[in-house]
A protein has these predicted regions:
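Conserved beta-ketoacyl condensing-enzyme motif
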Residues: 1-39, 43-59, 65-82, 147-163, ...
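Short, well-ordered amphipathic alpha-helical segments that serve as non-catalytic structural scaffolds
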Residues: 15-19, 44-47, 105-112, 128-133, ...
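Condensing-enzyme catalytic core mediating Claisen C-C bond formation in acyl metabolism
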Residues: 174-238, 244, 309, 314-321, ...
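Conserved catalytic cysteine-centered active-site region
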Residues: 2-57, 100-104, 174-198, 279-309, ...
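N-terminal extracellular/periplasmic Venus flytrap/periplasmic-binding protein-like
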Residues: 122-216, 279, 284-286
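Active-site-proximal alpha-helical scaffold in enzymes
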Residues: 36-66, 113-142, 205-212, 277, ...
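Flexible glycine-/small-residue-enriched beta->alpha junction loops
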Residues: 59-111
Length: 339
């Protein structure tokens, strides 16, 4: 089992191992936690694929998980300094801060918007489209086959709530959208709480196996992995790292851009999707057709796996799809699957 997880502070030892034991899998199951920031869930799928290709295993579960609502605040060790001590937000420090430039990932997004001349209006329009696509997808039950209801325990003996669908896409107010203040750059800024992704809890997982194992276990595969590729660039340019990884993937697989039916590019910020569409000259009608992280949420260690899960269900038989996700530090992962 490979499970992506970014903010592991206060989770206890080996989060992937915990997921296996508490899920009731055999204690002999081999487990590894993967941290490639937002690409963690997708990298888990790629590592699983490599394990199958090398013959190390023949059945591997891969995915990602993040509970951002439970990430603690940090307090430095040592004596209490005169004047008090400062708590550090674990989400911001370990998940959302560019180590090299010492500022929030949103500042990197602003830098990309400026470089590529992507306006606030373009980002808002993209975000509104994402919310509308997700609402329409839920209406059409496009997510029905990939969602697992989760019982959420309640206090004081109250019965658990059965959590069956994403919440974020319902929380939008389109009338106030273009009036929201910019967050990271007050003057001439473009990124707002509306056109960026949100802080969320979530998990996604896939079972991967060799063709021989599928035959032996008498299971019918949903899709096959065609290829995968990583890419890296300057840390401040992380939003456009998918545009580094995707061409490598297409070259490696020998597949033309025009032959890709659907694209899933993670919406850490709306500018990420807009920028990569622009650089790669992708058809917007084929990108994030059911919305993405802006409208559904972005539990950082999980999102990369969710993109792959959704492609498995959204593609039609015989179609190929590409999922890509950028990550802090200037990286990105990409994967191609065929239904």
């Amino acid at each position: 089992v490979y499970m992506g997880n970014v903010c592991s502070g206060y989770l206890g030892q080996a989060p992937a191992r915990q997921s296996v034991i508490f899920a009731g899998l055999p204690k002999s199951t081999i487990c590894t936690t993967v941290n490639k920031v937002c690409s963690s869930g997708m990298k888990s799928v790629m590592l699983a694929t490599q394990g199958l290709q090398t013959g190390t295993q023949d059945v591997i579960l891969a995915g990602g998980m993040e509970s951002m609502s439970n990430v603690p605040y940090y307090l430095k060790r040592g004596e209490t300094a005169y004047g008090g001590m400062q708590l550090v937000d674990g989400i911001v420090f370990d998940g959302l801060t560019d180590v090299y430039n010492k500022f929030h990932m949103g500042n990197c997004a602003e830098n990309t918007a400026k470089k590529l001349e992507i306006t606030r209006q373009q980002q808002d329009e993209y975000a509104i489209s994402s919310y509308k696509r997700s609402a329409a997808a839920y209406e059409a039950k496009a997510f029905a086959d990939e969602l697992v209801p989760v019982p959420v325990p309640q206090k004081r003996g109250a019965p658990p709530i059965l959590f069956t669908e994403d919440e974020e896409y319902k929380k939008v107010n389109f009338e106030k959208f273009n009036k929201l203040a910019t967050v990271f750059q007050k003057e001439n800024g473009t990124v707002t709480a509306g056109n960026a992704s949100t802080l969320n809890d979530g998990a996604a997982a896939l079972v991967l196996m060799t063709a021989d194992a599928a035959q032996r276990l008498n299971v019918k595969p949903l899709a096959r992995v065609v290829g995968y590729a990583d890419g890296e660039c300057d840390p401040i340019d992380f939003p456009i790292a998918p545009a580094v990884a995707i061409p490598k993937l297409l070259e490696k697989t020998g597949v033309k851009k025009e032959d890709v039916a659907l694209w899933e590019i993670n919406e850490a910020f709306s500018v990420v999707a807009v920028a990569n569409q622009k650089i790669l000259e992708l058809d917007p009608a084929k990108v994030n057709v059911h919305g993405g992280a802006v409208s559904l949420g972005h539990p950082i260690g999980m999102s990369g796996a969710r993109l792959v899960v959704h492609l498995c269900h959204a593609l039609k038989k015989g179609e190929k799809g590409v999922a890509a996700i950028c990550n802090g530090g200037g990286g990105a992962s990409s994967i191609m699957i065929e239904k």
